[in-house]
Amino acid sequence: MGIFRFISISLAAVSAANAGHILSMGHAKTIPNSYIVVMKDGTTEEDFTHHQSWVQSIHTHNVTRRGLLDNAGVRHKYGFGSMMGYAGLFDEDTIKDISDDPKVMFVEPDTTITIHGELTQNDVPSWGLARISSQRPGTEDYTYDSSAGEGITVYSVDTGVDIHHEDFEGRASWGTNMIEDGYDKDGNGHGTHTAGTMVGKTFGIAKKAKVVAVKVLDNNGSGPTSGIIAGINWCAQHASQNGGTDKAVINMSLGGGSSSALNRAAAQAVQKGMFLAVAAGNDNQDARTSSPASEDTVCTVGASAENDERSSFSNWGPAVDLFAPGSNIVSTRPGGGSQSMSGTSMASPHVAGLGAYIMALEGISGSAVCDRLKQLGTSSVTNPGPGTRTNILINNGDAKNGGKKPSQPSQPPKPSQPSKPQQPSEPQEPSEPQEPAPGQPAPAPAPVPQHPHTPFPNDDFNFDDFWKKYFGTDHWRKTFGRFWN
């Protein structure tokens, strides 16, 4: 009898050791009774289905017995690639039972994610476009290849997009709404602004790319981490069915406290071939404290000012991969016209747009895009911040060609119809054809210079082996780099 009792205790100990655990979220703002559950690698579809049925059964029993949580249970399911999991509202007894299941890797309290942008002054010229095709600040022309991101889809994981804004020329579409507020519009303005920087005909970098609105933040610019993960999952599934994940970009101008689940979801999308640009954050602190910016496989973007100095608000540190214009950036606003905003939220869409541009031009995808942007960029940013390992400012390659404008430029696109009369800008004379410098490739044909400085009125105003990645050296080096020699 004693032998059998010993075996039973031993098996129970093994089961407990193999079960999941509930992660602590530190100082992040948690959402009461809301949790994200991530299943272990190797969980089959059948096991996952049985687990969900079991969860619903015990949850119904517990809430009926205790009379809790009217709007409860599983709300989001994640099933793309290696990442299996779900999120929902559960009482304490249910979430303890879930975390004790050996099939569960971990349970994470749901937290609030917010935008990384803030409204600034109105009617200032947007300098970001010109800067990313020039050797030095102060130029006024944006020179780019006429392919302009054609064939690439950019997913705006944000507050939504005004898809009817004329600057999108019919290339914007509504994808999904994870907020479930019944308001399939951008009631904040943040998402429309970032989308304009990515693909708008006037303020955009990839002027022929498409943009899909994926609403994960409410009209106040905040939303649950579980909804962000659901948004990434939706993007990956949609891209795989519409042109391929290797022709897709996700921009995430948002962030919150460190989240293992959110970082895993972002890494899974990159592993499938998508390019993810993520805002570093606006707290003037180490970006490793924020998700999804702390995920090693995404392209984390800090903000620069017009004088090429790191913007005072921009996060810094080893997690930052690149810098891009982020102070006083003018772009589209809901309802028409434009507005100026500042933040790493404005820097990230510059990288997303340029990523789409390079993907169309060179046929690369996934993490290779961020590496390519590092090669094309210029070492221009001053005061990049403590522990930051780069001072690279993004560039579309024009500066690598000696700052010379390619020959035979085509006409720039016409700006959006302003709400007040404006004087038209003078057309730019094309430069003479130039021979490439020794060792440099010939310039790409049919570039287009643009005058991005026309002011517009304003009416006021983050798997090769998915699980291995999480436990691998690179992930921990990035997350806890301050402790490494």
Curated annotation (Swiss-Prot):
Record-stated family: Belongs to the peptidase S8 family.
Biased composition (Polar residues): 377-394
Gene behind this protein: SUB1
Compartments, record wording: Secreted
Active site: 158, 190, 345
Residue span(s) of domain Peptidase S8: 126-400
Compositional bias annotation for Pro residues: 409-418, 433-455
Role description: Secreted subtilisin-like serine protease with keratinolytic activity that contributes to pathogenicity.
Span of domain Inhibitor I9: 34-116
Top-level taxon of origin: Eukaryota
Region described as Disordered: spans on this chain: 377-462
Gene Ontology BP terms: proteolysis
Keywords: Glycoprotein, Hydrolase, Protease, Secreted, Serine protease, Signal, Virulence, Zymogen
Protein name: Subtilisin-like protease 1
GO molecular function: serine-type endopeptidase activity
Signal peptide: 1-19
InterPro entries named in the record: PCSK9_ProteinaseK-like, Peptidase_S8/S53_dom, Peptidase_S8/S53_dom_sf, Peptidase_S8_Ser-AS, Peptidase_S8_subtilisin-like, Peptidase_S8_subtilisin-rel, S8pro/Inhibitor_I9, S8pro/Inhibitor_I9_sf
Cited PANTHER family: ALKALINE PROTEASE 1-RELATED, PEPTIDASE S8
